[in-house]
Amino acid sequence: MSKIADDQYFNDEEEDFAKLLEKEETLEKGTIKEGLIVSINENDGYAMVSVGGKTEGRLALNEITDEKGQLMYQKNDPIVVHVSEKGEHPSVSYKKAISQQKIQAKIEELGENYENAIIEGKIVGKNKGGYIVESQGVEYFLSRSHSSLKNDANHIGKRIKACIIRVDKENHSINISRKRFFEVNDKRQLEISKELLEATEPVLGVVRQITPFGIFVKFKGIDGLVHYSEISHKGPVNPEKYYKEGDEVYVKAIAYDEEKRRLSLSIKATIEDPWEEIQDKLKPGYAIKVVVSNIEHYGVFVDIGNDIEGFLHVSEISWDKNVSHPSHYLSVGQEIDVKIIDIDPKNRRLRVSLKQLTNRPFDVFESKHQVGDIVEGKVATLTDFGAFLNLGGVDGLLHNHDAFWDKDKKCKDHYKIGDVIKVKILKINKKDKKISLSAKHLVTSPTEEFAQKHKTDSVIQGKVVSIKDFGVFIHADGIDVLIKNEDLNPLKKDEIKIGQEITCVVVAIEKSNNKVRASVHRLERKKEKEELQAFNTSDDKMTLGDILKEKL
């Protein structure tokens, strides 16, 4: 940098680092001397150091005390100190001497080509003109105007990168600029990014940091981000499962945002697209061998061996509809055979099935059983309308009305999960893959028991148990019998009470529907016929009118 440019770079408001240190850090101009500790006064916290002739300087003991509180020097030990003023008892500093020596050594190391050299250090101090930055034991001055830091924030302890912009051999100071670093770094990053974007071959970088959203890879001193979706052709993956800090990896640049200064890299772009490889080799219906790579509650991801993952939905794991979690059937690393049910290279989707390589339990059941067979099933699910029984790989429905002859009974009130029930197969629906079962058909129905005692036109007697719009139910011989409204005559329905005994005659017995109908009216007609028949066969010469009068 020229003298004119140098003067322009530092405005008039900035004070020389040496002067600032003189005011805030008391690093005043002076000399470094090899002295000798002549006395130590621990009570007052200082030591006297002879720096030549009769001159003795006062040295604060905290400058030569280690982290454990032990003195690093004793009486008569030689020590290098910085003499900051003249007189018989000048102030001397061990730390200033060491710091000044390190700065001077760094200046000599840098030589004349120091400009824009990059250092990385930590902010360890602050004064009114800027900040003190320490790097590898050397202190640098970062003026406020070159810091690119907010004035109202506490930056002590913050690690930064900056460029060296001035060295002062006479005053033993080195000035740095964070602002210049950004300018130089942005220019360099743009140049390297363009170089990467124009490159036709992958370049080798080093993994610098791993985050949940991707990995940062360093190349020629700049960082680029490989988003987790650009790591593998499998799609978004967990970066930690693939890489660790320090790993070498080939990458390609895919974009650079000049406004945000972000370089986007890709790992998967460095290898051939495996989807192009398989699109002509694999078809729906093919059986392939895969390895379980990840298990979620909704399904399983499987690796087909060439950086492509297929998806095995939870519903395609087993014919059992009650798969609570895939981990109950499969484990990570397990090798299995699956059937391809859908392949879409354009959208990079591969769906597979495990259960379709096994016989459908319904088909197996249907081949071994037929309607009318008696089987045993275990209660798997209870609902308001019935129970599902596991029949060994396939479920059958035992509806409430097929479980009990009593239409008011429900399975959930009489069975519990795990109960084993003997049932009869009522129906096998091949189209919908459904099986209907019955438990009540294995026991004699109340109607059948009733039919063994009573025939049509038999006279029965029962008590009224319910009154409906369409008729009256009486309970007779263990079964409810319906008397329709038109069969109640000569009884008046509005006069009938619950618990009232009614005598009637059986008019219908429906065993299949478990129903019995009766009639009071028919009983009356039957009685009339019997009386008329008795009159016709009797020797008594009573008239029909007499008989009717007697009846009334």
Curated annotation (Swiss-Prot):
It comes from the Bacteria. The keyword Protease does not apply. GO terms for biological process: translation. Keywords: Repeat, Ribonucleoprotein, Ribosomal protein, RNA-binding. CDD domains: S1_like, S1_RPS1_repeat_ec2_hs2. One of its GO terms (cellular component) is cytosolic small ribosomal subunit. Coiled coil: none annotated. GO terms for molecular function: mRNA binding; structural constituent of ribosome. Residues 31-101, 116-179, 200-268, 285-355, 372-440, 457-521 form the S1 motif domain. Binds mRNA; thus facilitating recognition of the initiation point. It is needed to translate mRNA with a short Shine-Dalgarno (SD) purine-rich sequence. Belongs to the bacterial ribosomal protein bS1 family. NCBIfam families: PRK06299.1-6, rpsA. This is Small ribosomal subunit protein bS1. The gene is rpsA.
